[in-house]
UniProtKB/Swiss-Prot annotation:
Activity regulation comment: Inhibited by CCCP.
MF (Gene Ontology): potassium:proton antiporter activity; sodium:proton antiporter activity
Keyword rRNA processing: no
Stored PANTHER family: MAJOR FACILITATOR SUPERFAMILY, MULTIDRUG TRANSPORTER MDFA
InterPro entries reported in the protein's UniProt record: MFS, MFS_dom, MFS_trans_sf, Sugar_transporter_CS
Protein name as it appears in the record: Multidrug transporter MdfA
Family designation: Belongs to the major facilitator superfamily. MdfA family.
Gene: mdfA
Length: 410
């Protein structure tokens, strides 16, 4: 492949600066969601809106993340990953500052949607470039370690957001997000390699439709992409719904709400760290299967505990922590195998994968909101368990071929 970066033993500072700056941008977009969620109670109060707008803010953000994925991946294949990625960072900076002008909750939510478009660039462009730039074992290790940095957002976001809202206006958060993205822009401008292989080809809607049709006809790819969406949805639903579950439902303080995020996202990071240690010694297939056990056990514990006692929020936290550890162990390898399940250019494949996931997240978070409003913690966690069962069923299809992910080279 052109512009292939050196393997792990020979990675220099310039090569490492690219993933580091990409993850800083990813961090800024993630904390743009996780830090504002505890502040959403203050936002809806300022705009005199109902608490049902709290998770809707995240729904709008993720809907934006689905909006342009279909175009950005193929576009970056043809005009280059670098210019598209850099444009995405600038877009995020501008929309973060524009939200300071919102006059009501509807305008705020619209701007959250526009901010969410920035998520499209991470998967469809940035991570496609990462996958194209590094060999498989190195790539999985880098992806897992990058995920740890990105996961500081949901770990620190609720704590910092809850503390911030007591001393500073919520608007200041968006200035912080824009500043972090600006730093990543200068790093990416300096260090991001150009890995696109179809530069100069004409982009037509007919060809685009043909490419996506070929990708979506690949049953193994679709199974993997849907599985990634379903297995991650309980975590996203928790991020969206937990301010209401913990602060409104359980009558705990915003500080206690922040503390309850620590075991869940700490377990997620622990799973990623274990993955990084095991990658060179175990096959991707075995790591996915290994992660499946805590995923299913954790979701079952959370569902059983809250069905028996709706206010068993500590058991729910424990179950979701076990589940999160499994995700940390399994997801990076599943992303890799899904992306390479299709021979189509990785910009298109990554975009298709991202769209399927964002569709599941956008619809799923709204369903989880209504599940909690109508059935409390029990129905919320039963919905999460259903997603785990769907993931398990899709994994049976995805890993049906015994050779899938069964070698260290891929």
């Amino acid at each position: 492949m052109q512009n292939k970066l050196a393997s792990g033993a020979r990675l220099g500072r310039q090569a490492l600066l690219f993933p580091l700056c990409l993850v800083l941008y990813e961090f800024s977009t993630y904390i743009g969601n996780d830090m504002i969620q505890p502040g959403m109670l203050a936002v809806v109060e300022q705009y005199q809106a109902g608490i049902d707008w709290v998770p809707t803010s995240m729904t709008a953000y993720l809907a934006g993340g689905m909006f342009l994925q279909w175009l950005l991946g193929p576009l970056s294949d043809r005009i280059g990953r670098r210019p598209v990625m850099l444009a995405g960072v600038v877009w995020f900076i501008v929309t973060c500052l524009a939200i300071l002008l919102a006059q009501n909750i509807e305008q705020f939510t619209l701007l959250r949607f526009l901010q969410g478009i920035s998520l499209c660039f991470i998967g469809a462009v940035g991570y496609a470039a990462i996958q194209e730039s590094f060999e498989e074992a190195v790539c999985i290790k880098i992806t897992a370690l990058m995920a740890n940095v990105a996961l500081i957002a949901p770990l620190l976001g609720p704590l910092v957001g809850a503390a911030w809202i007591h001393v500073l206006p919520w608007e200041g958060m968006f200035v912080l997000f824009a500043a972090l993205a600006a730093i990543s822009f200068f790093g990416l401008q300096r260090a991001m390699p150009e890995t696109a292989t179809r530069i100069g080809e004409k982009l037509s809607l007919k060809e685009l439709g043909r490419d996506y049709k070929l990708v979506l006809k690949n049953g193994r790819f679709v199974a993997g992409a849907l599985a990634l969406g379903f297995v991650s949805l309980p975590l996203l639903a928790w991020i969206a719904q937990s301010p209401i579950i913990i602060i409104t439902g359980e009558q705990l303080s915003s500080y206690e709400y922040g503390l309850l995020q620590v075991p869940i996202f700490g377990a997620l990071i622990a799973g990623n760290l274990l993955l990084a240690r095991l990658t060179s010694r175990r096959t991707v297939r075995s790591l996915i299967i290994m992660g499946g056990w805590p995923i299913m056990i954790g979701l079952l514990v959370a569902a059983a505990a809250t069905v028996i006692s709706s206010h068993a929020y500590l058991w729910m936290t424990a179950g979701l922590s076990i589940y999160a550890f499994g995700i940390g162990l399994a997801n990076a390898g599943l992303v890799r195998l899904t992306l390479f399940a299709s021979d189509m250019s990785k910009g298109t494949v990554s975009a298709a994968m991202g769209m399927l996931q964002m569709l599941i997240f956008t619809v799923g978070i709204e369903i989880s909101k209504h599940a909690w409003l109508n059935g409390g913690n029990g129905l919320f966690n039963l919905f999460n368990l259903v997603n785990g069962i769907l993931w398990l069923s899709l994994m049976v299809i995805f890993l049906k071929d015994k050779q899938m992910g069964n070698s260290h080279e891929g």
